[in-house]
Curated annotation (Swiss-Prot):
The modification Phosphoserine is found at S240, S648, S765, S766, S769, S824. It comes from the Eukaryota. The gene is Spice1. It is found in: Cytoplasm, Cytoskeleton, Microtubule organizing center, Centrosome, Centriole; Cytoplasm, Cytoskeleton, Spindle. GO terms for biological process: cell division; metaphase chromosome alignment; mitotic spindle assembly; regulation of centriole replication. This is Spindle and centriole-associated protein 1. It comes from Mus musculus (Mouse). Regulator required for centriole duplication, for proper bipolar spindle formation and chromosome congression in mitosis. Residues 383-439, 729-757 form a coiled coil. Interacts with CEP120.
């Protein structure tokens, strides 16, 4: 075992590698644009787009289309593999159908080539024509013009009946024209479509065969053509220019030049070639049926041209012939005279047509006469031309003026039409305004008529006539009762009487606190009062109650009526009417009829304290007091309709439904209603007096209460029909019923007076009007509030002193006031204008009452 010594200082582990330190990458610095900014040379987006478009392939659309076609073909092959076989079948069928045509085309092409190559078939080359030299010679040279071979080619004449003459070489002018037409037709027919050319050639060959078979028909046509040519030659003038011309006369002619000779000699070959032309044209018609119409047109044109040329040559020949012979006959002068006569005749016709003077023929002999007539005719023509030119100019000027006038008239018409349209619009607007004005005036007239009908001044005379009757009734009532005097004229408020009507200011207007008994009475009262008194009533809250069982059915009905039905506008009410004397003192001078005794004022106040609805609907032991509001009124203008619909329209139906159609019936009805209102007021006054008497005797024993209760019950029973019988059978029955009720009330009043005498009650201790003057309250500014106590059913039978009268609406206050020898007055507070009750009863007695009923109104 050998040990190898290893050098410890040598490198151990040859696999060790030394770690290489990586160099950090140098930070790339930003472009330094301080010296040169290369962003200027950067391409813009537009340049990039343009370069991109430049480098695009030009065949891109074509390649794209080819790729699409290839894709479609692949798709069709995949979807319909039978299409290729179907197309092959179609091609084979088409080849079978058109094979014969293709074969005929090939045969015809070969035959055409052979015919073009064969030059000696008819001893001349096809399309060979004879030339006509165009040689110009001197005007005075006597050398004849170049001779022309007049003889046609013999082979063409021989083959004229076999081959169409348009394809042959002809010598005469007609032949030249026909060959020119054939060349033009050939050039037109030389189209890229070779099928039509070959078919035409084949048809020509077929017609050639038919011509050989139908020789008889051709002979007949030839004879017809010859006859036509003969008739046409007979129509031409017999004198031919060639026969008339001679060598001797050529020198004596006026215009004996070679030009005239050339003109005369020109038509000769045309006339010579004319029969050949006709024969060739008719043969062409027979052989070429397809080209009959154009050939006929060409023949007609040629005939017209020949006829015109013949006429010209005849005229020239005649003029030259007549001029060339001034010999013994003098034919030229005669011709000139004849021409001048014709000119003169035409001039005369022209003068007659234009309305000019016709000048006679100027006779003359010889050339001088001819020249004179010629010059005169020329002068006349020039003069007529000038006149016509002047007239034409005038017509043009007048036409321009008329056009200008027409334009002016059109402008005027346009302006007039615009003005008419504007006037129509204004007229329509004015009509609409007039219609609206008529409607408004009609409404104002209707409102004015209603206001005049409802004006209280109309009823003044009627009320003045009824005043003595009311005074007499008051006196009879005083005599029967033997008590305080009730004067309907004296104690009645001023606004209730028809003598004078005063408009109260807003701070002095009365407050309405009562409900009218019936609608008819309300209507009568409303007709007697001014319209400014009436205003819509304010809906009030019902009075407080302890329980519904305490109210009778009649009071329940009254309560619902007060809640749901607005109060009619009727005269001033309970507590305020007592101070009407003070109002009259302030507004009017004192009237002696108004100044009555305090007893009359007291009695009238007590009468108006009674609420009309309450006195008819209250029960025996359950009083009901209705308090309604009346805001301050302002007088309405005469042109405005009243707000109350009952007052704005005159009622035309009575209680029994009878209609009033005349003014007399309306006047009678108003009188009856006024009488009913008067009786109702008297009845209420009697009832008020009766209530005062019964309330004053409330302190006595129970034995005295029983007859009063019985009387009250009977009175209620008598009062209810007045409320329930709202529509009696007639007005007379209602008046009688009211009279009966008043008599019953009077009798009851007498009985009660006798009972009071027996008891020993002093009548002078009856309560005076407790209401103070309301002037202080109404003079205050701001809001006024009137609070009236509404008594109800007593809570218990213990408070016997508060027994309520069955008729009076505020009897609870008077009964309580009878104990303390004073009724509960209303203190008019000066600060707030608020009426508060001053009652000597204790708070416990006040709690027993039904509640409070507040009425408020604002004075602007």
């Amino acid at each position: 075992m050998s040990l190898i010594r290893v050098n410890r200082f040598g490198p151990r582990g040859g696999g060790r590698k030394t770690l290489k330190v990586k160099k950090k990458a140098a930070v790339r610095q930003e472009w330094d644009n301080t010296v040169n900014d290369l962003t200027v040379h950067r391409a813009t987006p537009e340049d990039l787009v343009r370069r991109h478009e430049m480098h695009k392939s030009k065949n891109r659309a074509l390649v794209h289309w080819e790729l699409q076609e290839k894709a479609l073909k692949r798709k069709w092959k995949k979807q319909k593999p039978e299409t290729s076989s179907l197309e092959k079948r179609k091609l084979s069928i088409m080849k079978e159908i058109l094979s014969d045509q293709y074969l005929t085309q090939d045969v015809l092409e070969k035959s055409d080539h052979l015919m073009a190559a064969a030059k000696g078939l008819f001893a001349d080359v096809p399309r060979k024509r004879t030339g006509f030299p165009n040689v110009t010679r001197a005007p005075d040279s006597s050398q004849s013009h170049t001779g022309i071979n007049q003889d046609p080619v013999t082979q063409s004449i021989l083959n004229e009946s076999i081959i169409e003459p348009q394809a042959l070489n002809e010598v005469d002018d007609a032949g030249e024209q026909s060959t020119a037409h054939s060349q033009s037709e050939d050039s037109e027919n030389e189209l890229p479509n070779s099928l039509s050319q070959h078919s035409n050639r084949s048809t020509e060959r077929f017609l050639h065969q038919l011509k050989e078979e139908n020789s008889e028909l051709i002979n007949q046509l030839w004879t017809d053509i010859q006859q036509k040519i003969a008739t046409q030659s007979q129509r031409t003038p017999p004198g031919s220019p060639s026969s008339e011309l001679s060598a001797e006369d050529q020198k004596a002619a006026l215009n004996a030049t070679d030009a005239v000779k050339r003109i005369q000699a020109g038509p000769q070959p045309e006339e010579a070639a004319e029969p050949v032309d006709f024969s060739s044209s008719y043969l062409g018609q027979v052989l070429n049926t397809r080209k009959q119409k154009p050939l006929l047109a060409k023949v007609k044109r040629k005939q017209d041209m020949h006829a015109a040329s013949k006429q010209k040559t005849n005229m020239l020949s005649s003029s030259t012939a007549s001029a060339d012979r001034p010999s013994s006959t003098g034919s030229s002068l005669d011709v000139l005279k004849h021409v001048i006569h014709e000119v003169e005749h035409e001039m005369e016709e022209y003068e007659r047509c234009t309305g000019r003077e016709v000048t006679g023929l100027q006779g003359g002999q010889g050339l001088t006469g001819f020249t004179l007539s010629l010059v005169s005719s020329l002068c006349r023509l020039v003069r007529y031309l000038k006149e016509s030119e002047i007239q034409l100019r005038k017509e043009v000027e007048t036409r321009q003026q008329l056009e200008q006038m027409l334009g002016d008239h059109r402008e005027l018409i346009d302006a007039l039409t615009a003005e008419i349209l504007s006037l129509r619009e204004e007229n329509s607007t004015m009509q609409a305004r007039l219609q609206q004005y008529m409607v408004t005036t009609d409404e104002q007239l209707i409102s004015l008529t209603h206001a005049i009908k409802n004006c209280p001044v109309i009823n003044n005379s009627r009320q003045e006539s009824q005043a003595p009757e009311r005074a007499a009734m008051g006196r009879r009532l005083v005599d029967n009762v033997e008590g305080p005097v009730i004067s309907s004229n004296g104690s009645m408020p001023l606004m209730f009487r028809g003598e004078e009507v005063v408009e109260f200011p807003q701070e002095e207007l009365p407050v309405k606190l009562s409900q009218g008994p019936t609608p008819t009475e309300n209507l009568n009262l409303a007709n007697n009062f001014p319209t400014h008194i009436f205003e819509p009533a304010v809906m009030l809250t019902p009075p407080r109650q302890k329980s519904n069982s305490e109210f009778s059915p009649l009071q329940d009905v009254l309560r619902r009526t007060v809640q749901t039905r607005p109060a009619p506008r009727i005269p001033p009410t309970v507590e305020v009417i007592e101070k009407e004397q003070n109002w009259e003192k302030k507004a009017l001078p004192i009237d002696p009829d108004i100044q009555n005794s305090s007893e009359e004022n007291r009695l009238f106040t007590q009468r108006w304290r009674v609420s009309h609805m309450g006195e008819d609907l209250e029960n025996k032991g359950q009083p009901a007091f209705v308090s309604l509001s009346q805001p301050p009124c302002s007088s309405l203008p005469s042109t405005q309709q009243p707000r109350n619909p009952v007052l704005s329209e005159e009622p035309t139906v009575l209680g029994d439904g009878q209609q009033l159609r005349t003014s007399e019936a309306l006047v009678q009805r108003k009188d009856i209603m006024a009488r009913i209102a008067e009786l109702t007021l008297q009845n209420s006054a009697i009832k008020a007096h009766l209530n005062n008497i019964t309330s004053s005797g409330g302190e006595q024993g129970d034995g005295l209460r029983e007859p009063r209760k019985q009387g009250s019950a009977s009175e209620v029973s008598t009062n209810f029909p007045a409320v329930q019988s709202l529509t009696p059978s007639s007005m007379e029955e209602r008046i009688a019923e009211l009279n009966r009720q008043s008599m019953e009330a009077r009798s009851k009043l007498l009985q009660l007076i006798e009972q009071q005498k027996l008891v020993g009650l002093n009548l002078s201790s009856s309560p005076v009007s407790p209401v103070e003057s309301p002037l202080r309250a109404w003079a205050e500014e701001g809001k006024r509030t009137i609070e009236v106590s509404v008594p109800g059913m007593e809570a218990s039978e213990s408070s016997k002193c508060n027994t309520v009268s069955p008729v009076s609406g505020n009897s609870s206050r008077r009964s309580s006031g009878a104990i303390s020898n004073s009724c509960s007055p209303l203190n008019a507070t000066s600060g707030s204008g608020k009426f508060t009750p001053v009652n000597p009863r204790t708070k416990t007695e006040k709690k027993n009452e039904e509640g409070w009923f507040a009425l408020s109104a604002h004075i602007p």
